[in-house]
From Swiss-Prot:
Cysteine pairings via disulfide bonds: none
Membrane topology: Multi-pass membrane protein
This protein's UniProt keywords: Cell membrane, Membrane, Transmembrane, Transmembrane helix
Protein name, entry field: UPF0324 membrane protein lp_2841
Subcellular location: Cell membrane
GO CC entries: plasma membrane
Length: 336
């Protein structure tokens, strides 16, 4: 009975993901992930707004995104860090710190909850949907907040994906390393990084991917820090005898983030066969797109539009902080 209850929503999400992959061949600038979430939003708020899809879309949104995060670990190694050098690592660490602090500060100014601020900070600083899915359980974020931030981060990422290649060529000219740093150090998802860098050339793709992987490898650190910050907030509220939600389970590291870390360590130590990394990447990408379709199906467009102006300001503000800080840091640390 449980499988039967899940199937309608799961199959619907899969069909949207397949259609999105097909459409992405004709509109590569958008990418399958963005198309999936947009088609999901359209369907979920019109003819696919059916309660029988709820269990399946919830499963796809949560579980498939978790498996996607874990499988990412098999696609990277610690040795990657050496390819961008000490200043490259310093650039990524500074860029991520500025993004997180900036997103938390701006979110507070705009009146967003702590969970939305943390999801926005982690999603933009690390790796989009995967980071948001990893952070959500350790800060007890509800499904609505998670879906809203994932949608916002993906839409903002699409805008940056189309503009950063032009900006990179205008500012850094022929330097593929600097353009790769701008794209890989700023864009949210791996797919967006590859798509944006491909608009320049294949060498830029390679450098941009290395900078992006460095950010992904910081996922565990960000999850642990945010988990600790949330735990401290709960402790402060308890100390003040406030009413605290009982959702917290005290786990700072979700199982799939631990799995990500184990697979990354394993690949670093024994170098897994290329076929395993390629297969893990393909499955991870498909799981993410199916999950994004489900998130779109579950997103209440009316509620999303109610906060539309604030959300747009938040997304635009965080995106601006990222781009400006990246340009300054690249000039100071990498341009010589």
């Amino acid at each position: 009975m449980k499988v039967k209850g899940i199937l309608p929503g799961l199959v619907t999400s899969l069909v949207i993901a397949i259609i999105s992959q097909g459409l992405a061949q004709f509109v590569p600038a958008l990418g399958a992930a963005t198309i999936a979430i947009l088609l999901g939003i359209i369907g979920g708020n019109t003819f696919l707004k059916q309660p029988q899809l709820g269990r399946g879309t919830k499963f796809a949104e949560s579980k498939l995104l978790e498996y996607s995060v874990m499988l990412l670990g098999a696609t990277m190694t610690v040795q990657t860090i050496g390819k961008i050098g000490g200043f490259g690592v310093l650039f990524i660490l500074c860029q991520m710190t500025i993004t997180i602090v900036g997103a938390l500060w701006l979110g507070r100014k705009l009146g967003f909850s702590q969970s939305v601020r943390m999801l926005m900070a982690g999603g933009n600083a690390v790796c989009g949907s995967s980071a948001i899915a990893s952070i959500a359980p350790v800060i007890d974020a509800d499904e609505d907040d998670k879906g809203t931030v994932i949608t916002l981060v993906n839409l903002m990422g699409t805008v940056l994906m189309l503009t950063l290649p032009v900006l990179g060529m205008a500012v850094f000219g022929g330097s593929v390393i600097l353009k790769g740093a701008l794209i890989g150090g700023t864009l949210q998802s791996v797919g967006q990084v590859v798509a944006a860098a491909s608009m320049i050339n294949q060498t830029t793709v390679q450098f941009a991917t290395i900078f992006k992987i460095m950010r992904i490898m910081m996922l565990v650190v960000v999850v642990l820090i945010f988990g600790r910050l949330h735990q401290r907030t709960i402790e402060n509220e308890l100390a003040e005898d406030a009413v605290v939600s009982g959702n917290g389970n005290g786990h700072w590291l979700p199982w799939y983030v631990a799995g990500f870390l184990i697979l990354c360590a394993l690949n670093s130590l024994i170098s897994l066969p290329a076929i395993i990394g390629a297969t893990a990447h393909t499955i991870s990408s498909w799981f993410e797109i199916i999950a994004l379709a489900a998130i779109g199906l579950r997103l209440n467009l009316v509620n999303f539009m109610k906060a539309g102006k604030r959300l747009a300001l938040y997304g635009l503000g965080v995106g601006t902080i990222q781009v400006v800080s990246a340009l300054i840091l690249i000039t100071l640390l990498l341009q010589h």
